[in-house]
């Protein structure tokens, strides 16, 4: 979602 670790949710980790 966003740049960085855990930018949005743990499910989308570094997506």
UniProtKB/Swiss-Prot annotation:
This is Conorfamide-Sr3. The keyword Secreted applies. Transmembrane segments: none annotated. Expressed by the venom duct. GO terms for cellular component: extracellular region. It is found in: Secreted. Negative results: does not affect potassium channels from drosophila (Shab, Shaw, and Shal), as well as the human channel Kv10.1/KCNH1/EAG1. Does not show activity on human Kv1.4/KCNA4 and Kv1.5/KCNA5. Its main location: secreted. GO terms for molecular function: potassium channel regulator activity; toxin activity. Belongs to the FARP (FMRFamide related peptide) family. The keyword Ion transport does not apply. This peptide has moderate activity on some voltage-gated potassium channels. It reversibly inhibits the Shaker voltage-gated potassium channels (Kv) from drosophila (Kd=2.7 uM). In addition, it also irreversibly inhibits human Kv1.3/KCNA3 (IC(50)=24 uM) and Kv1.6/KCNA6 (IC(50)=2.7 uM) potassium channels. The modification Phenylalanine amide is found at residue 15. Keywords: Amidation, Ion channel impairing toxin, Potassium channel impairing toxin, Secreted, Toxin, Voltage-gated potassium channel impairing toxin.
């Amino acid at each position: 979602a966003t740049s960085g670790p855990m930018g949005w949710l743990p499910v989308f980790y570094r997506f």
